[in-house]
Regions:
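Leucine-rich solenoid repeat scaffolds
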Residues: 167-195
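Intrinsically disordered, low-complexity regulatory segments in ankyrin-centric signaling systems
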Residues: 1-26, 35-38, 58, 195
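Ankyrin repeat A-helix N-terminal signature
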Residues: 10-15, 43-49, 76-82, 109-115, ...
């Protein structure tokens, strides 16, 4: 690995946009792999370093390149609500069908975490609301099972339903979303699912 490439990896993770630019100008490998197989763009995304990510994306970094645990800049930004970076990845060819190590699209962890603006962005971009991950769950299942039933999760469920999520898809154990919500006492979510 060249010095410029080492500098690029460090600068991206630190969010030092000027150092990123210098390293790229010095011929650094924009797709080099650092710790954990992270590209400079994945490293910048994981640290939510917007300016560094912007420079890398504009210089042609692959928004779909995955690290050793199957995170890409697109998937990670979606999963963590790094919406500015997410929008950039979507504008630069993010693969909406790409999946993480759990076989889920970016919409599933965004829903699990109650990240309403991120859920809206992903649905608007065309991510399939009914994709089923390796656990047998859709975004709707995750919002119910791993959420806390609070108002933000009610909004996520409403947004998923308005975005076309199918409330009749059963989880891997054959349980409907409405039954999952009822079992947890999430009355407001039950009401959304029954509307």
């Amino acid at each position: 690995m060249t010095d410029a490439t080492s500098d690029l990896l460090a600068a991206a993770a630190a969010g030092d946009a000027d150092a990123v630019r210098r390293a790229l100008d010095a011929g650094a490998d924009i797709e080099a792999r650092g710790d954990g197989g992270m590209t400079p763009l994945v490293a910048a995304t994981k640290a939510n370093r917007v300016d560094a990510a912007r420079l890398l994306i504009e210089a042609g970094a692959d928004v779909n390149a995955k690290d050793d645990i199957q995170d890409s800049a697109y998937l990670y930004a979606g999963a963590r609500g790094h919406d500015e970076i997410l929008r950039m990845t979507l504008a630069h060819g993010a693969d909406l069908r790409s999946t993480n190590r759990f076989g889920g699209t970016a919409l599933i962890p965004a829903s699990e975490r109650g990240l309403l603006p991120t859920v809206e962005i992903l649905l608007e971009a065309g991510v399939d609301p009914d994709h089923i991950n390796n656990l047998g769950w859709t975004a709707l299942h995750e919002a119910i099972v791993l959420g806390d039933g609070s108002a933000r999760y009610v909004e996520v469920v409403r947004t998923l339903l308005d975005g076309g999520a199918d409330a009749t898809i059963r989880d891997g154990d054959g349980v409907l979303p409405v039954d999952l919500a009822a079992a947890r006492g999430y009355d407001a979510i039950v009401a959304e699912l029954r509307r």
